[in-house]
């Protein structure tokens, strides 16, 4: 069982020199505007820390959070950072993540050695969008051998049971979701505990 011992906001950065020192492993959370990033981060960290932008598509800040998790089963305590990136694809003409994030954000992803895991949030109701396909290609193209990329489906509870099952069968594994009611789902779907364990496992595969 994973216990969240601490979770707090560190800083917001708009330039590389404003970012905190790379002293611990980091996971990046990215996704389209309105995909549910803030909801997922708050669920993951067990605390209402992330706020939705009042002007989606306008802010170009990277928000850093620090958290400490205790894995009781393995007697392991880990402190790491979560980096919340601005939602992409807000402008209808935006089809290219790298171009949209040119400058600070793309440089951050390219050079920050402490980033070990990219979590790409995808709206379970809107699969195979061009901007999500492009984002996946762009992120995977810059992955180092010590980094991993995972997809996680948000708003899973908005699907009916047949749609949930179809997504479960066809989605890449590990199958990861976020929902407002984990306990109401069938036992074949991952619990919040399993989501946390999976992300921690990938984060620690190549620790800083």
UniProtKB/Swiss-Prot annotation:
Gene Ontology terms, MF aspect: GTP binding; metal ion binding
List the record's Gene Ontology CC terms alphabetically.
cytosol
What cofactor does this one take?
Mg(2+)
Q: Which GO terms describe its biological process?
A: division septum assembly
Q: Where does GTP bind?
A: 31-38, 57-61, 84-87, 154-157, 182-184
Highest taxon above the source species: Bacteria
Q: Where is the EngB-type G domain?
A: 23-205
Quote the record's binding site residues for Mg(2+): 38, 59
| SUPFAM superfamilies per record | P-loop containing nucleoside triphosphate hydrolases (SSF52540)
Matches recorded under InterPro entries? G_ENGB_dom, GTP-bd, GTP-bd_ribosome_bio_YsxC, P-loop_NTPase
Q: Which cysteines are joined by disulfide bonds?
A: none
Supply the CDD domains for this chain: YihA_EngB
Q: Could you tell me the keywords of this UniProt record?
A: Cell cycle, Cell division, GTP-binding, Magnesium, Metal-binding, Nucleotide-binding, Septation
**NCBIfam families from the entry?**
GTPase_YsxC
Q: What does this protein do?
A: Necessary for normal cell division and for the maintenance of normal septation.
Which family does the record claim for this protein? Answer: Belongs to the TRAFAC class TrmE-Era-EngA-EngB-Septin-like GTPase superfamily. EngB GTPase family.
Q: What is this protein called?
A: Probable GTP-binding protein EngB
What is the source species? Helicobacter pylori (strain HPAG1)
């Amino acid at each position: 069982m994973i216990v969240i011992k601490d979770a707090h906001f560190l800083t917001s950065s708009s330039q590389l020199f404003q970012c905190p020192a790379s002293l611990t492993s980091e996971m990046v959370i990215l996704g389209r505007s309105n995909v549910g990033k803030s909801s997922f981060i708050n669920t993951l960290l067990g605390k209402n820390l992330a706020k939705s932008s009042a002007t989606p598509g306008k802010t170009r800040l990277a928000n850093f959070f620090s958290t400490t998790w205790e894995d009781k089963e393995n007697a392991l305590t880990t402190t790491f950072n979560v980096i919340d990136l601005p939602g992409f694809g807000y402008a209808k003409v935006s089809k290219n993540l790298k171009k949209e994030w040119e400058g600070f954000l793309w440089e951050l992803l390219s050079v920050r050695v402490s980033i070990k895991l990219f979590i790409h949030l995808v709206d379970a109701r809107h699969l195979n969008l061009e901007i999500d396909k492009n984002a996946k290609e762009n992120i995977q193209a810059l992955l180092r051998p010590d980094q991993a990329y995972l997809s996680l489906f948000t708003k899973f509870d908005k699907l009916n049971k047949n749609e949930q099952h179809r997504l479960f069968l066809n989605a890449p594994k590990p199958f990861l979701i976020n929902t407002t009611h984990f306990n109401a789902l069938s036992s074949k779907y991952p619990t919040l505990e399993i989501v946390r364990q999976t992300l921690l496992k990938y984060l620690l595969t190549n620790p800083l």
